[in-house]
């Protein structure tokens, strides 16, 4: 599927806010709302990849706990891991 940037951002915002668990809805929603308009194309693609991970592994990754999968090191994942939810 070939999405333009506007469509991709819209898809990412939706997926960030409707994850399945309230905690991840709030955390990823706040993260996405803060950074979505500051990201370049590569970062948007990496954010979409991050959203493909299940909530449990994302929550553990964010909190520095052991994950069941290998999560690659990139700018988005580092930005997410260091994001301070307020």
PLM regions with names:
Residues 2-44, 48-86:
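Positively charged, polar, low-complexity stretches
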